[in-house]
Amino acid sequence: MAASTGYVRLWGAARCWVLRRPMLAAAGGRVPTAAGAWLLRGQRTCDASPPWALWGRGPAIGGQWRGFWEASSRGGGAFSGGEDASEGGAEEGAGGAGGSAGAGEGPVITALTPMTIPDVFPHLPLIAITRNPVFPRFIKIIEVKNKKLVELLRRKVRLAQPYVGVFLKRDDSNESDVVESLDEIYHTGTFAQIHEMQDLGDKLRMIVMGHRRVHISRQLEVEPEEPEAENKHKPRRKSKRGKKEAEDELSARHPAELAMEPTPELPAEVLMVEVENVVHEDFQVTEEVKALTAEIVKTIRDIIALNPLYRESVLQMMQAGQRVVDNPIYLSDMGAALTGAESHELQDVLEETNIPKRLYKALSLLKKEFELSKLQQRLGREVEEKIKQTHRKYLLQEQLKIIKKELGLEKDDKDAIEEKFRERLKELVVPKHVMDVVDEELSKLGLLDNHSSEFNVTRNYLDWLTSIPWGKYSNENLDLARAQAVLEEDHYGMEDVKKRILEFIAVSQLRGSTQGKILCFYGPPGVGKTSIARSIARALNREYFRFSVGGMTDVAEIKGHRRTYVGAMPGKIIQCLKKTKTENPLILIDEVDKIGRGYQGDPSSALLELLDPEQNANFLDHYLDVPVDLSKVLFICTANVTDTIPEPLRDRMEMINVSGYVAQEKLAIAERYLVPQARALCGLDESKAKLSSDVLTLLIKQYCRESGVRNLQKQVEKVLRKSAYKIVSGEAESVEVTPENLQDFVGKPVFTVERMYDVTPPGVVMGLAWTAMGGSTLFVETSLRRPQDKDAKGDKDGSLEVTGQLGEVMKESARIAYTFARAFLMQHAPANDYLVTSHIHLHVPEGATPKDGPSAGCTIVTALLSLAMGRPVRQNLAMTGEVSLTGKILPVGGIKEKTIAAKRAGVTCIVLPAENKKDFYDLAAFITEGLEVHFVEHYREIFDIAFPDEQAEALAVER
């Protein structure tokens, strides 16, 4: 620190700041640096910030520095006056032009000499910034990384032209220092002076201060750099006279002369622009301006009161003098700069030339900032209050816990956990081997730390182990009359299922105890397999639990995970016992025929232990790892088909067929169950919506021919929903659905004809089939593919082509039938060689539907013989049965479904294998009523039925 008569100079690394002695005295002989330290007499500072950057950081001396700097700026040039002014200014100018001599390694910090700001400086380097524009009289730190712009700014500083144009980019996401087009920036910006520049090699960090608003006129080309003087490396020390002449010559040149004229070819990046000063509109200090000014000052003070971030700096700036308040131009800029508004809103204030409008816009932004500050303060108070309450509650709880522990009123956490688990087991009959495990785990729990992972694993294991209802059973209902009433109330038909459940109750009543059973209901969808299980649970007074294994691929879903895994838990069976709180629930395992298989194992194999009455008394779950007795559980499984159920699993279950419904059964179910349920669901009563039996019959016949009643339920609900809409919309007070207006509710009929052929031509025979959806009629068509050529020489053997998306089994059945038909015809009519020499095409209609199975063998033989003889079979005849190569008719399945399908199609005569006689006679009387049935053992019997008028002589007719 060097002192003289009027001034004190603070020496930095590359420049000095000149302060008046009264200011140094006011600071007590010390000066605050930008880093917050104090500079004492005789010390140096390398701080890069000028004194005006310290506004609001120290005592009131900061305001004096600000006022002094403003005064010096208005005075024009370096701090004039005093004997050190010329020398200090010269040395600072040398430092500003040539950088820091002997600064050593590290970044070069250049502090520029304060100089007179030119009123007109049209050619400026362009710096594009984002987010916040620079307002006049405000300082901003800017970093520049673009190499071309860095070189340009270095050259301008060396030429004593530390002026730039700072403009805001339209796109805030653009981080580049330069732009490729003037359209990427707002054309109104700020003329700024570089007060300090820190050269970091690959980038520049500058402190710039805005002075006035400017507007871009056009883009300029960057002028080439002038060659340096030959005596560049000569010593810097010159005579005072030479230095004075150089300064006079430099000051005599107008700054605008240093810029080059633009050329037609402009660079790709905008580095230099021509600007013109923005002139404010003339204004008078009216009452409106005074009111806006006062409101801005009031709002700023309110923001300061709410947000301490603004308090020190803004108070210092406003206390420096009332000149700020009296200057509407500066006040509007300061108000906008204090806000965190959007960039386009701040730019709007910068571009506004009408001072009252600018004041109004600045006031709007300040009001938004004030509301945001109030919201932040409210949220802060709420969070602080919540934290205080939580902390206070925690302290009180800890104190209460200590007091209770001292008085013996509260036990340790581990003791409380052990007491809770033992309390659960008091009323249960726990097996000895399970109780030993519980005692061992409780002892282990007492030795573990409360916060260890093993503690939580052991506690969860004990929680599951003590939640099992050991020895707890629900009181079963053994009253046959009550059970039968419940089953009849919930379901219509299903006599086989009801009879089996009543038998189970009767056996339990005679034995005086109940045992678990494994039943499997299989049949088409929608016949009530799942719902009957719930009714059985209600009839037996057992708890009900259902889970589906359709698509299940993980064995752990059934048998649980090992406790060593994170997040391990028991399987579905143990979860069922915990939920039902009894050891004798009814467990429904749904969709057992659709169980999957994955890399985790085969769940169907895991069910073998579960569904084996000899093994499930000691079922071992992987998680519990103790045997659990499931012998009292009634397991019911459901499936659509039995083919996909593994044979060992099927062997463990008692299979009960739940067949589809005929039209009479569907009508009864709809009237007794579906329509009342749908009315209640739609909020209607019988007087509001009427559905007659004729409507339901037509609905079943033309819309719902499947075996189940699920689709019928949907159609009934659809009719009642539309009825409810008409009533609510005011179209009608009540709705009566008739066969004539049924299409208005459910659309066009889905089924318009009963069967494909009303009269079957030669070569066409009706067969019977059944699928998971129920029974159906199936026509077999045969036709001549290529004419018979009796005069052809060589091989005259015929052929058979089959189509209709047939499976492998059905294709084999067709080949067997073709061979047998040729042999049968050759045996009974040697003269008829039609099948031997002809090329025949066999087709089963509805080719998009896959078909498979052996039961169409006799139907194919009959169709081939009908084609060979050229005579149709008996009308209204349908048949099913597998044929062997010798003509023996083998039994098939699905007799009930096939019989129902035949009756639905209007068939009056059916042919069945003799071994299926018992299945047919098990059917209800209303199903077999009106049917002529023939049980056959050999195809010769079928031939006599299909062609009743044919004699042996007719077979010999040549075609």
Swiss-Prot record:
Give residue ranges for domain Lon N-terminal. 124-370
Q: What is its EC number?
A: 3.4.21.53
Entry's Gene Ontology molecular function annotations: ADP binding; ATP binding; ATP hydrolysis activity; ATP-dependent peptidase activity; DNA polymerase binding; G-quadruplex DNA binding; identical protein binding; insulin receptor substrate binding
For this chain's UniProt record, which GO biological process terms are given?
Answer: cellular response to oxidative stress; chaperone-mediated protein complex assembly; mitochondrial DNA metabolic process; mitochondrial genome maintenance; mitochondrial protein catabolic process; mitochondrion organization; negative regulation of insulin receptor signaling pathway; oxidation-dependent protein catabolic process
Keywords on record:
ATP-binding, Cataract, Deafness, Disease variant, DNA-binding, Dwarfism, Hydrolase, Mitochondrion, Nucleotide-binding, Protease, Serine protease, Transit peptide
User: Which of this chain's residues are annotated to bind ATP?
Assistant: G523, P524, P525, G526, V527, G528, K529, T530
Q: Where is the active site?
A: S855, K898
Gly residues composition-biased segments: 91-102
The protein's matches in PANTHER family, at most eight in alphabetical order, are given as: LON PROTEASE, LON PROTEASE HOMOLOG, MITOCHONDRIAL
- HAMAP family given in the database record: lonm_euk
Protein's UniProt name: Lon protease homolog, mitochondrial
Q: What's the source species for this entry?
A: Homo sapiens
The uppermost taxa in this organism's lineage are: Eukaryota, Metazoa, Chordata, Craniata, Vertebrata
